[in-house]
Amino acid sequence: MPMIETVNLTRKYGDLTALDNLNLTIEEGTCFGFIGPNGAGKTTTIKILATLLKPTWGEARVDGHVVGYQNHLIRPIIGYVPDFLGAYDDMLVSEYLEFFAACYGIHGEKRMRVVGEVLELTDLVSKRKSDVNGLSRGMQQRLSVARVLLHDPKVLLMDEPSSGLDPRARIEMRELLKELRRMGKTILISSHILFELAELCTAVGVVEQGKLIFSGGISEMMDRAGSGSMVHVVVDERPQEAAALLKQVRGILKVTLEREEKVVRIDVTIDPKSGMPISDIPSRLIAQGFRVARFSHEPMNLETAFMRLTKGIVS
């Protein structure tokens, strides 16, 4: 049984469709990256799974329990980390965690032990007596993670946990998430920092305009977006002739023309199995009398695949 599953999940806000028949499956123990532009429906999906929103229609399940009907069974097994920290004024870190531990029904010596364990896991022991509102953004995000770990949930729902963090805090958050993955947690994480997701996640989903346009492994996503690295070339004149010449070259999978401000850019996809050096592209054009004004190489990675998928190249 999947740990997270949505079936034709739809959410409307008046005339706006935030989620449009989203069908998503996440297996237990998966670290799943949720990728999409702003307004694509990522936060809405996470809030539904966190039982904070009801679907307009369709269904969402967490560990087999249906959102909206079995919320009392879902809430004890999830931890929701929004992109902000909600805290009361004049509260110490230890008081903050003890308060939420009590909300989860953790009392007495067990509560003190659990609070100590999550402080150690999130490297916040030295901040135990610090004021919550005086913490840095990175420390506050780690405190949010500590809060949701108090009751040892099966599922973590994380909405932009690295948003607004400085480089050091992002690295520390990434290492913490890796540790949670090693602990076997099922993690759904939305982020705009795609290279971090490539390091963390075993699978990704791409959502655009409320629709899921891809779900699967990272290597599968790259294959879907188009194998091979891409080379961008701009010639001074006759771009159509230059493109026609390149289409005849063995080892080139695809050649397209893209209008870019005042010039026409030639996009060339090279077959990774061909062994063709990328320098062959401008060399061949120059040998045929073309003047190359600009040349750049775009290796295939998660960011490149995302851009291709969400520009309508595949969807």
Residue ranges of predicted features:
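Conserved ABC transporter NBD signature motif
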Residues: 58-69, 73-74
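Conserved ABC ATPase "signature" region
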Residues: 98, 102, 109-127
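Conserved ABC ATPase signature
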Residues: 131-138
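Conserved catalytic motifs of ABC-family nucleotide-binding domains
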Residues: 152
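Catalytic Walker B motif of ABC-type/P-loop ATPase nucleotide-binding domains
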Residues: 156-159
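ABC transporter nucleotide-binding domain
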Residues: 174-270
